A protein has these predicted regions:
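Non-catalytic, mostly N-terminal accessory regions of nucleic-acid modification and defense proteins
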Residues: 1-164
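Glycine-rich SAM-binding Motif I of class I
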Residues: 176-177
Length: 177
C-alpha cells in the first residue's frame, strides 16, 4: 500500500544514520501510540487521554532541534515510570533517532499528516505487517518470516501475565518469537 511505502521510505532515510529496522518500528510504535492517544482525546471521541499533559503528542509538535530530542527522550523515560498499561508500553523505551531534524520530520511530516484513528484497523495492521515483511525480506534474505521485536514480545507477556503451567494460544503467532 502507499502508506507502507511511505513508512518504508522514511525507514531507509533513518537507516543511513545507522538505525536498524527493528529500532525504526519500535520508535514508530511509540510515536503512533502518542498520536492516536491525542486523536482519541479530540472530537468526536473526546476520551480522556492516558498520556499526562506535557508528555503528549502536542508537546512534541511544539518543539524542534535539540529541545525536541531532549523532550522526547524525557517523555519516554517518564511514561515508562507510569503505573499500569502505559508504563508497560513505554518500559525501557529509549529514543534511537539521534538527529533532531529527522525526528521532527518523522513526527510532523509523516505521522502527524495522517488521522491514524480513522484508518481502518486492517489498514494499520497491513501497514505494520508490511513493514515487518519488508524487514524480513531485506534482513533475512526473503525468508518470508516475520520477526516480532523482543520489546513487543516482553510487553505482550507482561499484559497476558501467564502463570506457571498455563498456556496461551495465538494461532497466528508462527514460532512465537
Amino acid at each position: 500500500s502507499a502508506l507502507v511505502q511511505k513508512l518504508w521510505n522514511y525507514c531507509n532515510i533513518l537507516r543511513d544514520d545507522g538505525l536498524s529496522y527493528g529500532d525504526y518500528v519500535e520508535q514508530l510504535t511509540y510515536l503512533l501510540f502518542l498520536k492516536m492517544a491525542d486523536e482519541q482525546s479530540r472530537p468526536p471521541h473526546n476520551r480522556p487521554s492516558p498520556i499526562p499533559k506535557g508528555f503528549d503528542w502536542r508537546s512534541l509538535l511544539k518543539l524542534d532541534g535539540d529541545d525536541l530530542e531532549t523532550h522526547y527522550r524525557h517523555a519516554l523515560e517518564e511514561l515508562g515510570k507510569r503505573p499500569g498499561m502505559l508504563g508497560l508500553i513505554f518500559r525501557k523505551a529509549q529514543n534511537k533517532i539521534q538527529d533532531p531534524a529527522k525526528l521532527r520530520r518523522l513526527i510532523v511530516d509523516l505521522i502527524n499528516k495522517e488521522e491514524w484513528s480513522r484508518l481502518d484497523a486492517d489498514v494499520k495492521g497491513d501497514a505494520y505487517e508490511g513493514l515487518l515483511q519488508k524487514n524480513a525480506e531485506d534482513v533475512k534474505g526473503g525468508a518470508g518470516q516475520y520477526f516480532t521485536p523482543r520489546a513487543l514480545i516482553a510487553a505482550m507477556v507482561d499484559v497476558m501475565a501467564p502463570q506457571p503451567g498455563q498456556s496461551i494460544c495465538d494461532p497466528a503467532c508462527g514460532t512465537g518469537g
